[in-house]
Amino acid sequence: MKSKNGLSNARFWILVWGLGIAGQICWNMENQWFNTFVYAKIAKDPTIISWMVGVSATATTISTFLFGCISDRIGKRKVMASVGYILWGIFTIVFGLTQYLVRGSTETSSVLMAVGVAVVAADAIMSFFGSMGNDIGFNAWVNDHMKDSNKGQIGAALATQPVIGTIVGTVAGGMLVGSNDNYMR
């Protein structure tokens, strides 16, 4: 059965669950494991992590206001979600590649500063596009498809996804971190 916008019911729910779970797992991995990555692969300096948290929170807030307004004006939620998720994925990979900026050691303050800035910038850009894809694009798109007959089902799906994302992110992330002594120094 197709809705008034031409989206089949099955396709709608596949998108709600697929994109929703993907977004929640990504946010969980970022919030739970990226500080471990920085501490183990970049430097045992909590200042970098503090800067990551502050700058990425600012970037996410700016993204939310900027792309939220743009999305409301032009109404292209699918475009926002698609572009945001793709760029989010690319910059998540870029963030992981920052470990290769450390060539041997970060014992000199100038090297540590340069690598720290690169890590913070990669995290902020990644979070910026994550907010564009998930918070602005996906959540607004789901809201556009909400009506009285499906509002409870959508609410239940969206409420369940962070729990599933946290469980999967914690278990899968823990297995990856623990395998082959990835983060043990």
Where are these regions (language model features)?
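A membrane-interface helix-boundary motif in multi-pass transporters
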Residues: R77-K78, S109-L112, M175-R185
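C-terminal ends and interior cores of transmembrane alpha-helices
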Residues: V83-M113
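Small-residue-mediated transmembrane helix hinge/kink sites in multi-pass secondary transporters
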Residues: F65-D72, A140, G173-M175
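Central cavity-lining transmembrane alpha-helices of secondary-active solute carriers
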Residues: I49-S71, I90-F91, I164-I167
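Cytoplasmic helix-loop-helix junction between adjacent transmembrane helices
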Residues: D123-T160
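Helix-loop boundary and gating motifs at the non-cytosolic
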Residues: K2-T60
